[in-house]
Amino acid sequence: MSDIDGDWERDGAICVRGALSPNDVALAARAIDANVADLSPLAKRASESADGAFIEDFRSWSRIADMEQFITTSPVAAIAANVMGATTVRLFHDHVLVKEPGTAQRTPWHQDIPYYNVDGTMNLSMWIPVDPVPRAITLEFVAGSHRGPWYMPRTFLDAQARWFPEGSLAELPDIAANPDQFPVIGWELEPGDVVCFHMQTLHTAAGNPGPGRRRVLSLRFLGDDMVHAPRAWTTSPPFPGLKEELPAGASMDHPLFPVVWPPVPPPSGTTSSVSE
């Protein structure tokens, strides 16, 4: 594998330098642009109307041909398998994040796993920028926070607790005021670099005050021990109807979550009642 900055087991986040070829990056960029030009009903604006534009969309791989091609032909799944030490890797979902120039809105500190309908320890989120990302606006992590605990997930714009009742989880600590207790790591990135992090690792990102776009494709991967964990609330992203098809504790063996490593031919003639 390419040069690695960081330690996965220790930090819960690493940077893989030069992981993707220029052709891979160009394909990912086309996928992002196609997605932004044709947003799904799951898309949202995560910034105020007067503040640039921070656009997110989810679960587009099955309708954006360039995205599916990137996932299946680039080395991203092999990298995920190598980092996790997994024998089988499934795609959980894709997530497009675009911060246009002049966007002040930060992505606040959060963990991904509390928003999801999965449990287990072998998982990986991959952050794939197709534009240069200066250190000042890159994704940052609290090293070692993948070991827990869970912190209260809140909405990004108005800090509402929509997923867990108030008081049921610990609130986020003051990370900036306690750098020795919560060491922050992050990397300046060039197209071709990818950042891998555990779904329980605390992370944040600044706005994009500069003149260039910050386009990112983030892919979420599931390893060997990940199982379905139906929630009493609407997850982000949602998977309507899935709890009727996969019981709690079942492996994520479902057409919505295809095996991407080792490579397998797509199933034919498979139907599902789960909403696409």
Regions flagged by a language model, labelled:
Residues 1-11, 16-109, 114-117, 232:
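Non-heme Fe(II)-dependent double-stranded beta-helix
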Residues 31, 38, 42, 46-49, ...:
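Non-heme Fe(II)/2-oxoglutarate
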Residues 76, 86, 101-103, 121, ...:
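Short, charged/polar surface micro-motifs in flexible loops or helix N-caps
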Residues 87-89, 93-94, 105-107, 122-128, ...:
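Generic beta-strand structural signal
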Residues 95, 111, 128-132, 141-143:
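Short, structured patches in soluble enzyme cores that scaffold and shape functional sites
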Residues 112-114, 123, 203-208:
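Glycine-rich phosphate/pyrophosphate-binding beta-alpha loops
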Residues 117-134, 188, 196, 220-223:
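Short, conserved beta-strand element in jelly-roll/cupin
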Residues 135-202:
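Double-stranded beta-helix
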